[in-house]
Amino acid sequence: GNMFGVKEFHKTANKAGIKPILGCEIYVAKESRFRKDKEKDKKSDHLVVLAKNETGYQNLIKLVTYGWTEGFYRKPRVDIELLREHSEGLIVSTACLAGPVPRAIMSGNNAKAEEIISTYKSIFGEDFYLEMQRHKTGDPEKDERTLKYQEEVNQEIKKLSEKFGVKYIATNDVHFVKKEDAFAHDILIA
């Protein structure tokens, strides 16, 4: 991900009397950020990373920068090593269906989901959250399938939350504010 709009967002929010929450959806390489394997690194997992203080903001900037300068392959990517090194002051959640835990659940690999939760909990402690989503995509052709996957993932998230003592939060997979920006977003991620 990127943080190109942070300065303008921060200024506008403060002007309106709103405390801005600064963060970024980042991509996590399957293994090392340095590996660029055509097949294994085709898709990276998503994580939502929020800064809870100045230290977290500085660490978030470092993660995003390293993603672009060291981990870029199709997209800017970080790895577990960088997350461990720059975890202080950050709040992390498992993101949308393209996050590591939802992907493991959807592939029927609950052992992998548990391993991922253990890893992130060891890095971020109480600042690691599991995400639950239930919303339409805006594309009627995708809605039925997406809602089905979200429901399956949500049921498992509840169980994993209890088993690992990790809280879950309700979120939406939002990437633009105005409906008319959907086309531009689709082009951007194509």
Region spans (language model):
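Phosphodiester-processing cores and adjacent nucleic acid-binding clamps
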Residues: 1-190
